[in-house]
């Protein structure tokens, strides 16, 4: 079932992107720009998501250890934890917004 799902997703991506690829101009400057933008987006989003996930995991670990040592402060710890998660997630969202701006800002329009 998993192999079928992977093949289905690859086929779907190929079908959805084929028309854009075949209709694109072959200007090397445009190809280089969008190639670098895509590579940067993949690296940036991967680093942001990985770092955010690691930070959230460490935060959860600290909350659980603090609650186990002193159950009376669990409410305060959870409040601080939710605020921390929101700040971590906002960094990932900022990277996503930057990537979307990079993709949709067309420097080749005259």
Swiss-Prot record:
CDD domains per the UniProt record, alphabetical: ATP-synt_Fo_c
PROSITE patterns in the cross-refs: ATPASE_C
Signal peptide stretch: none
Residue(s) at site: Reversibly protonated during proton transport: 89
GO cellular component assignments: plasma membrane; proton-transporting ATP synthase complex; proton-transporting two-sector ATPase complex, proton-transporting domain
Coiled-coil ranges (or none): none
GO molecular function: lipid binding; proton-transporting ATP synthase activity, rotational mechanism
GO terms under biological process: proton motive force-driven ATP synthesis
Residue ranges of the TM segments: 4-24, 37-57, 81-101
Record localization: Cell inner membrane
Protein keywords: ATP synthesis, Cell inner membrane, Cell membrane, CF(0), Hydrogen ion transport, Ion transport, Lipid-binding, Membrane, Transmembrane, Transmembrane helix, Transport
Entry membrane topology: Multi-pass membrane protein
Subunit structure: F-type ATPases have 2 components, F(1) - the catalytic core - and F(0) - the membrane proton channel. F(1) has five subunits: alpha(3), beta(3), gamma(1), delta(1), epsilon(1). F(0) has three main subunits: a(1), b(2) and c(10-14). The alpha and beta chains form an alternating ring which encloses part of the gamma chain. F(1) is attached to F(0) by a central stalk formed by the gamma and epsilon chains, while a peripheral stalk is formed by the delta and b chains.
Family per similarity comment: Belongs to the ATPase C chain family.
Name of the protein described by the UniProt record: ATP synthase subunit c
Lineage: Bacteria, Pseudomonadati, Nitrospirota, Thermodesulfovibrionia, Thermodesulfovibrionales
């Amino acid at each position: 079932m998993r192999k079928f799902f992977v093949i289905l997703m690859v086929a779907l991506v190929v079908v959805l992107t084929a028309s854009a690829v075949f209709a694109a101009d072959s200007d090397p400057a445009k190809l280089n720009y969008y190639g670098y933008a895509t590579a940067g987006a993949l690296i940036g989003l991967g680093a942001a998501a990985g770092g955010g996930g690691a930070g959230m995991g460490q935060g959860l670990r600290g909350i659980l250890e603090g609650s186990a040592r002193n159950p009376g402060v669990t409410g305060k710890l959870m409040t601080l934890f939710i605020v921390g998660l929101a700040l971590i997630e906002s960094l990932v969202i900022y990277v996503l917004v930057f990537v979307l701006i990079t993709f949709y800002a067309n420097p080749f329009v005259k």
